[in-house]
Amino acid sequence: MGNIVDYVRTDFRTFAEHPFSAVDSLVLSELSYIRLPLVVPVFGAARSIDTIALTGLLRAEDFPMMFAADSQQVNSTRLDLLVAVAESPRFRGLRVGEYIQRDDVDREQQFAAMTFDLGDCTGIRGLFGPGGLLYVAFRGTDGTLLGWKEDFNMAFRCPVPSQESAAKYLSSILDRSAGVPGGDAPAVMVGGHSKGGNMAVYASVRMAARDLDAMQWLADESGESQLPMIEATSMAGRRTSDKQLRIGSADPGDAGNISRGVQDNQNLPTDSTTQHVQPAQRNRYAARICRVFSHDGPGFPKRLESAAFDAVASRVDKTVPQSSVVGMLMDDGLPHRVIEADAVGIMQHLGMSWQVQDGEFVAAPGLSATAMFAGSTVNAWMLGIDPADRRKVIDELYVIFSTPGYRSFGELAEHWTTALPVIIDATRKTDRETRRLVAGVLAALPATAWRNLPQVPQLVIDSLR
């Protein structure tokens, strides 16, 4: 047994010998955490999908920028993964591009995505046809307070800005990779870790909703009352009815362009659900999405009871570790597989701890008692108060942890001797419910972001309860 780095280093089978699996998906999802350099084509700059060979990322002068978002240990492991993938005969031919990154404090958004082209990897075209395979990867939450805030915003709002951006991104990739009429378009897989998994599911459901809208238009024009089935390229979807998806639209301000961040890319469509697309073109979107991967990704505030969700659900492969907390938040009813991990507690959320044997995840007997307790407790809190109160508490938490002036939990941990008193002082000015939640966060942080602390003094935590 080993982790995904060990897997890539030692498993030299081609995709013809061992088809694409959830382990391969986690490999690409982990690579999406890397902050790609300027050499990588930006999103939407070309009419077709623009990529470079993954080996083009192996430039030492770029590494300080590429691996600067998380702890030194995590960054080092991701560099090991990148080098292993670049050297691996299984992934030889892998390309990456269509990179976009946006960190927007005003909109409380942390979003990044990239597209991997596996068409030149040995065995892929034999499995997926001459068009090959694209894997759209959405980055999960990094260690920033901004990313943490958007995650918690999901408790009272759907969609959050990153979910909307994910739908627009996926729509554009599907549009621009369709090729000429009669040509062979690549199959598409979508996935991500943590929040990235949630965005993968949401974006895919939005594409299915577009298909249903288009087919309803065709049915109305032809006088048919029964909508046809939406099927995946290589995995059949469920039969759908004429029930339509109605996901809340984004705030009016969400219609603005999306930037790459430091590279100022502004090419996401302003509204992918209303741009003019002929029905004959629109009804291909969900059919080209053959699988959707959510690696310990949270669900939605309420289950998306819709034909579009049902059309996608059979293609979703959700995996969670034994001590999953994040992946069990806002449980949406999607089946999940429980995976062995060699970390302790909430640290199992890190995909690098998941155990792999013979190219597949090692199955665990079920969720741990701690995970079930934590999940039920947090979900009970979310369901126990109305969305307005949830928003108030979450906003207060964000203000409190932002008060010391640091961008990430890592920086807070590094400067804890000055940051902690500021946090405690700000917390004491809030109501009892907020103080209790802050105490809970502080109690959990030694196992996560506050690694530099031997422990948060229990007296400090008790004083906030």
What is each stretch, according to the model?
Residues V42-A46, D50-L54:
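N-terminal, charged amphipathic alpha-helical interaction modules
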Residues V201-V205:
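Short glycine-enriched nucleophile-adjacent loop
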Residues P89-Q101:
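Short Pro/Gly-enriched beta-strand edge/turn motifs at strand-loop
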Residues G2-F20, Y33-L36, L54-A84, R90, ...:
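Alpha/beta hydrolase fold serine-hydrolase catalytic domain that processes acyl esters and thioesters
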Residues G192-G196, A200, Q275:
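Gly/Ala-rich beta-loop-alpha elbow adjacent to hydrolase catalytic centers
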